Amino acid sequence: MTTQVLKRKAFIFFLVAPAFLVLIGVVVYPFIFNIIISLSNMSLAHIRDWHFVGLKQYVNVFTEESKPNFYSVFLKTIIWTVVNLIFHVVLGVFLALLLNQKEIRGKAIFRTILVLPWAVPQLIVALTWRGMFNYEYGSINLMLTHWFGLPAVQWLKSPFETFVAVIITNVWLGYPFMMIIALGALQSIPHELYEAAEMDGASWFHKLKNITIPLIRPVMVPAITLGTIWTFNNLNIVWLVSNAGEPSDQTHLLVSFVYKAAFNFYRYGYGAALSMIIFLILLVFSLTFMRKTRATEAAY
């Protein structure tokens, strides 16, 4: 290997090294430290004299009979993720199909308006929707009572209504991402394919089934995977709209359950163990989903 090649490789390493150092500092080190904490009894009472306890914290996650427990929170997290993803994908693809029509004028204006929910910070979105769900003065109840003659709903007083309110908020917040991804995929489909299908007498449904969906799938599958991870780990909306899992801690997701265990009850070892379980759940899901849907295959 010549001196010139060595210098070139050293220069490349010199350029890449800062990024690697930042990656190690903000990702690798915290991840390894979290694993270490999950194997310890670290808590507020043992913040300095903590020691390793093996897998005890992991066992506690699955065996503690607290209310809510891991299983009820996990089930609610699955329901939350599935319902949100269904609405995100269906609404996003539907709106993308509308915006992709040539007959629609002012597409740029509509696109900007529809993207706004995703552009607004989650803190503002959560607090705005929380105000809209207010029992006495919220705009949601005002519309229900004045426009439709329905009784006002106590959105944030019972577990079911609060959970529905949180889902509505996150659906409004999350559909623009899927819409933008789907719109980009639709615009990359050659128009000649639709023209050939029309010449063969294909209906709108057959074009959607045999051309549109197969060709946007390689783009949508990674987007759905990302959306699943983001929704599964969404702390801000649940925490702010439901006021930290209220009422009676019945609207917790796994991620808010971790936050409360670690930073409200100061059970750092328990929270770290639960966060590692969440990581493993999402890792297994992502690898399985990407493999089963063949996301890396070319569309055409």
Mark where each language-model region is:
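A structural signal for multi-pass alpha-helical bundles of membrane permease subunits
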Residues: 4-300
